Amino acid sequence: MGFRKLLVAFVKPTCGLRVFLFMAELFETNSEPPVYRVIPVLELAEDPLDPVIQPSGSTLKSVANPLVLIRPCVRIIFSIGEWLFGFAVLMIGLSVLAAMPVLQFLSLGYLLEAGGRVARTGRLRDGFIGVRLAARLGGLVLGCWLILLPLRLVSDLAYSAQIIDPGGRTAAAWRIGLFVLMGLSGLHVGMACARGGRLRYFLWPFNFIWVIRRLLRGGYYSEARDIVWDTARSLRLPYYFSLGLRGFLGAFAWLVLPVTLLALGRLPAPLAPLVGLLGGLLLALVLIYLPCLQMRLAMKNRLSAVFEFREARRNFQRAPWAFAVAFVATLLFALPLYLLKIEFVPREAAWLPSLVFITFIFPARLFTGWSLGLAIHRAVPRHWFFRWTGRLPFVPVAGLYVLIVFFTQYTSWNGVWSLYEQHAFLVPVPFFGM
């Protein structure tokens, strides 16, 4: 209250009242009662009440909800696991496609698109295309495979019972149980796919309840149709096939003459060694420029880009050492597959060498795309010192690769035809070899 009195003491009356600070006497100059101007006064509030203070003997503690901290960590772990699973599924899928005639171009097209996208954006993470979608499709396939395991077991038991006691009651019971399990398994797979096809839906036995409720709301058919159609379009199969075919034709156009001359060097003719040597020199020269040219085709999405020789030289001048690293990685990662071609691989296991091919070539494509993107985003060439020193790894690495390729015709199962199996730029198993 003392503060309020002090505040009023500073206010001057509107008529006839003088206030002397710090004095109690008021001297009136007019007999009329003084009129004071009313001003708002902010009362000092007491200190806000503290939170409820627990008794000293209380054992309660204010602890944050642990779920708030656990849930983000769990989501991050599941997201990383889903990405890794999708990447593994993607590699296996590309390996299977690479071992199949004609469909090989889908695998090659994906590898070129991955490198081309990195070249356009300059970011390596953009080369991992469709990993989440691959995880979704891989979960669907894995769920169907898990559901079919009991069915295969019962089928084997029914077959064994039929062999032991043909026409007996035990064999008939197993056969009836097999048909019942087939119906239930098919129904469960259908309900899991109708709900979304995630892996967890295959492990949940009551999907039919959700499907019935969704059907009662209406519009399920049109929604499911649109989702399936959008998923099929997102795969971009015609685009990958077209890009892979054009990448194959462009690379083969550069390789066919040097490889043919190298193969002719094996003939029993006087000039055959010279022809083979000329083919080896031309092949080494082509190998120096072909990774950049083929990646330019993927980046520009046109076949004529694979013949833009001068543009490839300009790109090299802007990022010489990046191209050198990508070139060494491309040829070095292509060597392991030659070891797998020494022995004939059965058709059923043809995807295993393809898996080795995809595992090694995919990083090489990403590095080549990254080097091209680095060159595109630079306006001026690098210093002459880096340009000339960046050329040093090309000649010895290309010469060593040509030497290894020349001797593969004596170790490979396909003989001289193995010279045309340039899987560093073509498909892992050539189309004519199937």
Mark where each language-model region is.
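Charged, glycine-enriched surface loops/patches
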Residues: 340-351
